Design a protein with these regions (language model features):
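Helix-interface capping motifs at the ends of transmembrane segments in multi-pass membrane proteins
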Residues: 43-63, 216-251, 264, 268-274, ...
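Transmembrane helix-loop-helix hairpins at the membrane interface
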Residues: 18-98, 105-106, 151, 208, ...
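Actuator/coupling domain of P-type ATPases
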Residues: 2-3, 15-21, 71-73, 77-91, ...
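Cytosolic catalytic regions of ATP/NTP-dependent phosphoryl-transfer enzymes
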Residues: 162-165, 285-426, 433, 446-447, ...
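Conserved catalytic phosphorylation-site environment of P-type ATPases
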Residues: 91, 95-100, 166, 254-321, ...
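Membrane-embedded transport module
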Residues: 224, 263, 477-527, 542-716
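Cytosolic catalytic regions of P-type ion-transporting ATPases
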Residues: 62-66, 94-207, 488-498, 502, ...
Length: 793
């Protein structure tokens, strides 16, 4: 069958709609805005604005209203940005279906499959839609998703394969009869909201930190007004407004948003690098990996097999003819590749009758061969013949070739079992296939070594082939283990054996799972790659399961955390880099966020204890919080990675997020900002309260900008990289400086923000104070570089 034409498929797609189940409609913008207005912090601002209006200050109330609009807009924009990133990732990870259109087979997005399409089914793929089988060859389907019955159902031509069920063996062709909600799966689907994913370890840590800081923030926002009232016995109304503004500025409501946005945008960056994240917690786990178990074919090599050598005792013509028959002769029966047998068998029809053609590992074929084809015809296979043939296979493997053996025998008219088909064979010869190493594999493996990440190549190939390929990509094989050797070891012995090995040959997916669990028991954080149905347990068990996007099965992709669009090992390394960059940026954002809040509390508390007015009007505190939130939730997320990030050992995810080094750096940053603002405020106090407050306000905002640019590098100096390497932060910094100039020069803004005109000398005082404060932060960074040159903050 030629299948549908592309124009006809497009018409049917318009008529029947996409091949997907009906999803919950996205929330309209007005509902998101209402939810934003219902946030506790926004309600607190609304209450503050209402008090301003009630107490006869409509200008301040209007200013707070503008800030509320800006904050809600920022929050909704950030959430939509994260949702768009996640939706784009979901679309990238959507499975495809093999369809025949215009006489050609191509991969099409599953959503574009339409009634009338001819789809090709094979082991490891899900059935894309309800489809009536046109042909079936040993086809068995797992229908447990529909029926709950775990025993695979044998399928023949004429029967229906249902959408969402899994092909566990064999292959077939089918014509689609129903898609989307019209399928059996669509009729059974419940109208249920999608379950929320469980919180990640980092998410839990951030929420616990937020709860702890919430208590401190409430204490500060209540204590400061009370102490001020007791010491000064002043008017109550300004103190109430100051307390509300402090509560708004101090409560760490942005931290969960910072985490969600960081993870979502980090996942989008990974997608640009061909690593499609299916589970968001994988983004944070990638940066903690200590070990990677990787496939060879297609990951370290190009998966571009070229025939390099032929070894045929009876002549190459017989060998090539058998391979041609496998692909071109009419197929009577097929036994797909079996990992335990390491054989794939077909029974084809030829002019002279049926023939069994077997392809597989040399030792597996040799053990089932009773004869060998020689120039004079078939001869009995002696033990000496068998050893000589396997020695030839080993010689090819030693040259780094992937070696396959071919054998055949006549087939009678009746059906054969697999055991019958794969016994009494005549050995035809060997095919040596060359799979070129990926040029980027060697530097990627070197990067792993530098980063403290162990790499183990796990392959089904001959040990000699595996060792040659390992050396070609720069992976010194050391002791070469085989799957058979692992079978004879206890779990403890497996862990010990893996210590000195970089290659496991003749391995099965079951061996992959043992390797993963053995490493995890030893405290390693493990990534594993896989593409087959049987790889799913190892992919699910690993800390990060990585499936192949090109040749991988649906089952492997569904069990994985990350899908590689290009099947390239170097992409895994790039993903690890992104994971480390993401966590480093999250720490920077939180460090900046907490330092600013601590500095604000210290500045306000000092002024109260000295018997002075609070340095900031309530409306100024609210505006300052807006600028700080923008930097923490957007600018730091866009920060590129620091040099030397992959020279550090992997992060331990069990370590406290707010560790001693980070607390020390937060204290230093807060001290720098506190000293700058306090010095400028006290210096300007003799010229009047309004003047001093304005200088403090200007110093605070300029200090914010300088501190952000200093903290964007944990170890490098302020001037270590150009300011334009982070365009988001540069734009935010320029906007903040422009706002400062307008706030002291534009009469309308001066009234709204309670600022006074400043002379150039006042600006110089603010700038000098900021330089002094940032100098303290830079001095502390320099001390860390000297004391621990190779350790992350």
């Amino acid at each position: 069958m030629t299948g549908l034409s592309e124009p006809e498929a497009a018409r049917r797609l318009r008529r029947h709609g996409p091949n997907r189940l009906r999803e919950k409609e996205p929330e309209p913008l007005w509902e998101e805005l209402l939810e934003g207005l219902a946030e506790p912090m926004i309600l607190l601002l609304l209450g503050t604005g209402a008090l301003y209006a009630l107490w006869g200050e409509p200008g301040d109330a209007a200013t707070i209203l503008v800030v509320i609009v800006a904050l809600v807009a920022v929050e909704v924009t950030g959430e939509r940005r994260a949702e768009r990133a996640v939706a784009a990732l979901r679309q990238l990870s959507e499975p495809t279906a093999a369809v025949r259109r215009d006489g050609r087979v191509r991969e099409a997005p599953r959503e574009e499959v339409v009634p009338g399409d001819v789809v090709l089914l094979e082991s490891g793929r899900r059935v894309p839609a309800d489809a009536r089988l046109l042909a079936a060859h040993g086809l068995a389907v797992d229908e447990s998703a529909l029926t709950g019955e775990s025993v695979p159902m044998e399928k023949e031509a004429g029967l229906v394969a249902f959408s969402g069920t899994l092909v566990v063996r064999g292959r077939g062709e089918a014509e689609v009869v129903a898609t989307g909600d019209a399928t059996e799966l669509g009729r059974l689907a419940h109208r249920a909201r999608e379950a929320r994913p469980p919180p990640t370890p980092l998410d839990r840590a951030m929420r616990e930190l937020s709860r702890s800081l919430l208590v401190a923030a409430i204490a500060v926002s209540l204590t400061v007004p009370m102490v001020a009232w007791l010491l000064r016995d002043g008017a109550v109304r300004p103190l109430i407004l100051t307390g509300l503004a402090l509560a708004f500025a101090m409560i760490p409501e942005e931290m969960p948003i910072i985490l969600a946005l960081t993870l979502a945008l980090g996942a989008r960056r990974l997608a640009r690098r061909n690593a499609i994240v299916r589970r968001m917690d994988a983004v944070e786990t990638l940066g903690t990996l200590t070990a990677i178990a990787t496939d060879k074919t297609g990951t370290l090599t190009e998966n571009r097999l070229e025939v390099a050598r032929l070894v045929a005792p009876g002549g190459e013509g017989h060998l090539l003819e058998a391979e041609r028959l496998r692909g071109e002769a009419p197929l009577r029966m097929e036994f797909p590749f079996d990992r335990s047998r390491r054989l794939a068998t077909v029974i084809v029809e030829t002019a002279s009758g049926g023939r069994v053609v077997v392809k597989g590992a040399p030792e597996a074929v040799a053990s089932r061969a009773t004869r060998v084809l020689t120039p004079s015809g078939p001869e009995a296979m002696s033990e000496e013949n068998r050893e000589a043939l396997l020695a030839e296979a080993e010689a090819l493997a030693q040259d780094g070739l992937r070696v396959l053996a071919l054998a055949e025998k006549p087939a009678g008219p009746g059906a054969l079992t697999r055991d019958e088909a794969e016994s009494g064979l005549t050995w035809l010869g060997l095919i040596g296939l060359h799979d070129p190493p990926r040029p980027e594999a060697r530097p990627a493996l070197e990067a792993c070594r530098t980063a403290g990440i162990r790499v183990l190549m796990v392959t089904g190939d001959h040990p000699k082939t595996a060792a040659a390929v390992a050396r070609a990509v720069g992976l010194e094989p050391g002791q070469i283990l085989t799957g058979a050797e692992l079978d004879g070891l206890t779990d403890e012995e497996v862990r010990e054996a893996l210590e000195g090995a970089a290659v496991v040959a003749r391995a099965t997916p079951e061996h992959k799972l043992r390797i993963v669990t053995a490493w995890q028991a030893a405290g390693e954080r493990v990534a594993v790659t896989g593409d087959g149905v049987n790889d799913a347990p190892a992919l699910a068990a690993a800390d990060v399961g990585i499936a192949m996007g090109r040749g991988g099965t649906d089952v492997a992709r569904e069990a994985s955390d990350v899908v590689l669009a290009d099947d390239d090992f170097a992409t895994i390394v790039r993903a690890v880099v992104e994971g480390r960059v993401l966590f480093a940026n999250l720490r920077k954002a939180v460090r900046y966020y907490l330092a600013c809040k601590a500095a604000l509390a210290a500045v306000v508390l000092l002024s109260v204890l000295l018997g002075l007015s609070v340095p900031f009007a309530p409306v100024q505190i609210i505006v300052m919080e807006l600028f700080m939130d923008l930097a923490a939730s957007a600018a730091f997320v866009a920060e590129p990675g620091e040099s030397g990030l992959m020279s550090r050992p992997p992060r331990d995810p069990r370590a406290r997020f707010l560790d001693r080094a980070m607390v020390a750096s937060i204290f230093t940053a807060a001290a720098g900002l506190f000293l700058a603002v306090s010095a400028a405020y006290l210096w300007s106090w003799p010229r009047g309260e309004a003047h001093a407050r304005t200088v403090a306000f200007v110093t605070w905002l300029l200090g914010h900008v300088a501190l952000a640019f200093s903290l964007r590098r944990e170890r490098e100096p302020f001037t270590g990289r150009g300011l334009a390497t982070n365009r988001v932060m540069l734009a935010w910094g320029l906007a903040t400086v422009a706002f400062v100039l307008l706030a002291v020069r534009l009469p309308t803004l001066r009234v709204a923000l309670k600022t006074a005109p400043l002379a150039a000398a006042d600006g110089a005082v603010a700038v000098a104070a900021v330089i002094g404060g940032v100098a303290l932060v830079e001095w502390a960074k320099r001390r860390r570089r000297i004391d621990s040159p190779a350790v992350a903050d």
